[in-house]
Amino acid sequence: MRTTVAQFSAPRAGLPLQPMHSNTTSHFFTVDVEEYFQVKALESAVTREDWASRPSRVAASIDALLEMLDRHNARATFFVLGWIATHRPEVVLAIAAAGHEIASHGFWHERVTGLDREAFREDVRTSKQALEDLVAAEVVGYRAPSFSIVPGLEWAFDVLVEEGYKYDSSLFPIHRRGYGYPASPRIPHVMQRPAGRLSEFPLATTSLFDYPVPAAGGGYLRQFPLAIIRRAFREASERCEPATFYIHPWEIDPGQPRLPVSALNRLRHYRGLGSAMERIELILQEFSFTTIASYLPVLDARATTRTTAGAA
């Protein structure tokens, strides 16, 4: 029987994750689990105090994604807000029961650029605890809202290590206003930080005329030609290196309420909502996907081999 959110209308514990083992040619399908009213483009129209009174729409989108992933025998990593874990626990339980990885997206969807070290620590600690208490499994991954770990905020990696995370997936190897980490390697890699080792899974990019182009999904899936996304993942497959794709539940929900925001933010948030599901279907048909956590042993072994070779 297919797993749906409705099966988990009351919180339950003891649902272990069952990540699928992958080889180096499988890519990473990731979902940033948040409500439509929690995103940056709409924050001028909705305050945090309004969240609880807004109609929730995340469950239907999660059901659609779970069905699609199951049909393509794909496993995914879901970066979930702590707020979702406390307000819509059945959504998180359904994801875990379907065999996908649960990871952290912070608690309040606060960008790291607006937090100091201790506020960031509190955010990643409380979100990790909320998720682990709910699904009774360890949470080892984190993604910053809006990919907001940028140059100058490298201390965030040390906090993640100190709080028990094993990997991050916040770096976009591009330069964009508000986010981007151009110096990041484009492939999964291990960082040696003062606090310890942390694996990094950057978002997928490609190059046009030697210029790095974002090609990981999300708004780029909705607004760029699909050929750009396909190119990035084909290039990664040819290199036998996994690439990271992402999507938000609200991006496959064309029926969501339209909020009064600027023309630019309307374009960013609402354009392409009606075609996103079809495009995701095409991506899943062409490429295989698994969880990020399932690749950690492979990446760790490669990093250890390189370190040993370098010391010889």
Where on the chain are the PLM-derived regions?
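Active-site-adjacent pocket scaffolds in enzyme catalytic domains
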Residues: 133, 137-140, 144-241, 245
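Metal-dependent polysaccharide deacetylase catalytic core of the NodB/CE4 family, i.e.
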Residues: 72-153, 165, 170-177, 196-197, ...
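The substrate-binding groove and active-site-proximal loops of carbohydrate-active enzymes
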Residues: 48-56, 80-81, 108-120, 145-148, ...
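Short, positively charged and aromatic/hydrophobic N-terminal segments
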Residues: 16-18
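C-terminal domain-boundary segment and adjacent tail
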Residues: 21, 71-72, 223-312
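Active-site beta->alpha N-cap acidic-glycine motif
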Residues: 21-101
